[in-house]
Curated annotation (Swiss-Prot):
GO molecular function, one term: phosphoribosylformylglycinamidine synthase activity
Record-linked InterPro entries: Class_I_gatase-like (IPR029062), PRibForGlyAmidine_synth_PurQ (IPR010075)
Subcellular localization(s) per the UniProt record: Cytoplasm
The keyword Hydrolase is annotated on this UniProt entry: yes
Recorded superkingdom: Bacteria
Reaction catalysis annotation: N(2)-formyl-N(1)-(5-phospho-beta-D-ribosyl)glycinamide + L-glutamine + ATP + H2O = 2-formamido-N(1)-(5-O-phospho-beta-D-ribosyl)acetamidine + L-glutamate + ADP + phosphate + H(+); L-glutamine + H2O = L-glutamate + NH4(+)
Oligomeric form and interacting partners: Part of the FGAM synthase complex composed of 1 PurL, 1 PurQ and 2 PurS subunits.
Active site feature: C86, H195, E197
NCBIfam families: FGAM_synth_I, PRK03619.1
GO annotation (BP), single: 'de novo' IMP biosynthetic process
Protein name, per record: Phosphoribosylformylglycinamidine synthase subunit PurQ
This protein's record includes keyword 4Fe-4S: no
Function: Part of the phosphoribosylformylglycinamidine synthase complex involved in the purines biosynthetic pathway. Catalyzes the ATP-dependent conversion of formylglycinamide ribonucleotide (FGAR) and glutamine to yield formylglycinamidine ribonucleotide (FGAM) and glutamate. The FGAM synthase complex is composed of three subunits. PurQ produces an ammonia molecule by converting glutamine to glutamate. PurL transfers the ammonia molecule to FGAR to form FGAM in an ATP-dependent manner.
Organism encoding this protein: Ligilactobacillus salivarius (strain UCC118)
Length: 224
């Protein structure tokens, strides 16, 4: 399995993703510039956290127009795995690959800490090695991570099992239904505000995020 980590101007978690996949998981990973216009030869795509284009206008609002994004959209529509963390999640909502939106935290402050999550859905390429209902701890670091959707969409997400991760002990940003991560209807696109790539070694505090990437690599072995 060959994995692309997209690098936008202002990305700052691209290296974290690369290290989690390449150094810790021994995966075949390449950085791909936002200036490129194809993803030929790749089997999965990662959109990193950070502040793409300085978060001007709105988080992810300018990144959605990057030359690489039509290829990401086509990649996802072909059923291939696409993952976005933090700013990557915001970009995925901006381009319409994931429903809803991310707005400013209710506290109006940047929040940086480790939070407890509940795993709600293990039937995705990114969560198959977790157990449904399992509690895990992952870091967050964002100012605009409050998930919003209207009542009809929220009901649809819950009914379809599209909520993958939910804030457990506390809701750090005001996300509706305590939502921390969701998939599209097909289940091949996952966006989440927490950073699993920052929790892949005990040196970093815990390894609770490691199975996001190992699940993906196992998926690649099965389909490969």
């Amino acid at each position: 399995m060959k994995i692309a980590v997209i690098v936008f101007p202002g990305s700052n978690c691209d290296i974290d993703l690369y290290e989690a996949l390449h150094t810790v998981c021994d995966a075949d990973v390449e950085y791909v510039s936002y200036k490129q216009d194809n993803l030929d030869g790749f089997d999965a795509v990662m959109l990193p956290g950070g502040f793409s284009y300085g978060d001007y206008l709105r988080c992810g609002a300018i990144a959605r127009f990057s030359p690489i994004m039509p290829a990401v959209i086509e990649f996802a529509k072909n059923g291939k795995p696409v993952f976005g963390t933090c700013n990557g999640f915001q970009i995925l909502t901006e381009v319409g690959l994931l429903p809803g939106a991310l707005k400013q935290n209710n506290s109006l402050k940047f929040v940086c800490k480790t939070v407890e999550l509940t795993v709600e859905n293990t039937n995705t390429p990114f969560t198959s090695l977790y157990k449904k209902g399992e509690k895990i701890n992952l870091p967050i670091a964002h100012a605009d991570g409050s998930y919003y959707a209207d009542e009809e969409l929220l009901a649809e997400l819950e009914e379809n099992g599209q909520v993958v991760f939910r804030y457990s002990k506390e809701n750090p940003n005001g996300s509706l239904n305590d939502i921390a991560g969701i998939t599209n209807k097909q289940g091949n696109v996952l966006g989440m505000m927490p950073h699993p790539e920052r929790a892949v070694e005990m040196l970093l505090g815990n390894e609770d995020g490691l199975r996001v990437f190992k699940s993906l690599l196992e998926e690649g072995k099965v389909k490969g």
